[in-house]
Amino acid sequence: MERGAGAKLLPLLLLLRATGFTCAQTDGRNGYTAVIEVTSGGPWGDWAWPEMCPDGFFASGFSLKVEPPQGIPGDDTALNGIRLHCARGNVLGNTHVVESQSGSWGEWSEPLWCRGGAYLVAFSLRVEAPTTLGDNTAANNVRFRCSDGEELQGPGLSWGDFGDWSDHCPKGACGLQTKIQGPRGLGDDTALNDARLFCCRS
């Protein structure tokens, strides 16, 4: 989906926002039926545009953009971006990568995949709690649960704690939206703070 098309979903998403599992009418083009969230996301930044897998594709894997520790007196941002790797069934040779907005720092990891055609169905964020003194990082890492029960943990950093799992998509995730704090110059940067997944049924 082009960014312009994704941006048209924002008014609808604002109406659908809830702390957990949010039901929605099926979208005629992308077929998403719900949006799942976590309650542990960081407080900074703004929600970017959603990005969706092509029709008939589901997220079977993911990769992360992570800035390594910067030491003192560096400014750590930890997790900067999430990509979903979308596949149709068990065919990984024909995949599509979707990415909502990402932060400016770090490098992308190699993708981690669910086994045997399973799809990503739920997630949990590792988030460092805000501190008034010191360097905030917000989201540090993410775990995904596959439809066969396998759990995949990304190669993020270790500050903070993993929060509760989101609700589960009935079949699989098919889209992503991220909450990003833009660069703040000499201020404290946190980059990625929160994320949402879209669920599809076909």
UniProtKB/Swiss-Prot annotation:
Pfam families (alphabetical): VOMI (PF03762)
Keywords (A to Z) from UniProt: Disulfide bond, Secreted, Signal
Signal peptide (UniProt feature, chain positions): 1-24
SUPFAM superfamilies per the UniProt record, alphabetical: Vitelline membrane outer protein-I (VMO-I)
InterPro entries: VOMI, VOMI_sf
Disulphide connectivity of cysteines: C53-C86, C114-C146, C169-C199, C174-C200
The keyword Secreted appears for this protein: yes
GO CC annotation: extracellular exosome; extracellular space
Protein location: Secreted
Family: Belongs to the VMO1 family.
Protein name: Vitelline membrane outer layer protein 1 homolog
Organism: Homo sapiens (Human)
Gene for this chain: VMO1
